[in-house]
Amino acid sequence: MTNLPLRHSAEVAAAKAAGRPIVALESTIITHGMPYPQNLEVARQVEDDLRAAGVTPATIAVMDGTLHIGLEAHQLEALAQAKGVAKLSRADIAACMATGGTGATTVSATMIAAHLAGISVFATGGIGGVHRGAESSFDVSADLLELAQTPVTVVAAGAKAILDVAKTLEVLETQGVPVITVGQDSFPAFWSAESVFKSPLRMDDPVGIAAAHQMRVDLGLPGGQLVANPIPHTDEIPATELAPIIATAQADAEKHGIKGKAVTPYLLQRIYELTQGRSLTANIALVRNNARLAGAIAQALIANARIAGK
């Protein structure tokens, strides 16, 4: 641990020293989610939303072999403009660091980094999951196994709608991951506020979610929680409208032989084209919405710990 090339930004280091709430943020949305300069603008906006609520943002990335917990302004800008950045999960983060590489962290790698840094809450857009056709391709995101073993509460707008949501929920149940939807009974569908799937659990406020996180820690249970936060109805694309668009994108990916890590970026880009940019607008709205909730959960965790005298 002493030799680990890990560095906190000045802002994150100060927040840790003062016991202030911190929320981890992933970096693949910057490098693989949207073009420059929009990616930089959105990253700054999400960070500023957290700061406005009294929470410190910790955007996580690997740069020149060092794992950064929080990026300085110039580092964020450099990452936003970088080309050919690796997309890191549990499988390849160590190799990237060992070879002095640069990479953006997915959900699984961000969870690992957050836990190493003592950060309990992480906000993202949507988690990865079981891809459609996984019964033959075995394409299942490492995010699901990470949720089962790393004790970080992840706030997302559900699983990405391009996935097989039913199978994703089944795997999460098998792995013992609590799936908590906020404020409604149905599991959200990323760009759409609701889906046909009932959420395993429901909670209506960040205080309860924070208490559940702490209870898992106290019980000695491994793994984190998935907090499914529906996109606001004013920002959503209804599921009935999206279904045929997703089907078209899936068919195009199959026709062009897109496989592995290339599948998700291809589908997101194709859906962006087919929705004439509305999917990206919704994505930005849901990421900001998730960050705000994550901030409230982080604040509740700190408050609960103070009350308990921990």
From Swiss-Prot:
Coiled coil: none annotated. SUPFAM superfamilies: Indigoidine synthase A-like (SSF110581). InterPro entries: Indigdn_synthA-like, PsuG. Substrate binds at residues 87, 107, 141-143. Keywords: Glycosidase, Hydrolase, Lyase, Manganese, Metal-binding. The active site is at residues 26, 160. One of its GO terms (cellular component) is cytoplasm. One of its GO terms (biological process) is nucleobase catabolic process. The keyword Hydrolase applies. It catalyses: D-ribose 5-phosphate + uracil = psi-UMP + H2O. Its EC number is 4.2.1.70. Binds 1 Mn(2+) ion per subunit. GO terms for molecular function: hydrolase activity, acting on glycosyl bonds; metal ion binding; pseudouridylate synthase activity. Its cofactor is Mn(2+). The keyword Nucleotidyltransferase does not apply. Belongs to the pseudouridine-5'-phosphate glycosidase family. Catalyzes the reversible cleavage of pseudouridine 5'-phosphate (PsiMP) to ribose 5-phosphate and uracil. Functions biologically in the cleavage direction, as part of a pseudouridine degradation pathway. Homotrimer. HAMAP family: PsiMP_glycosidase. This is Pseudouridine-5'-phosphate glycosidase. The gene is psuG.
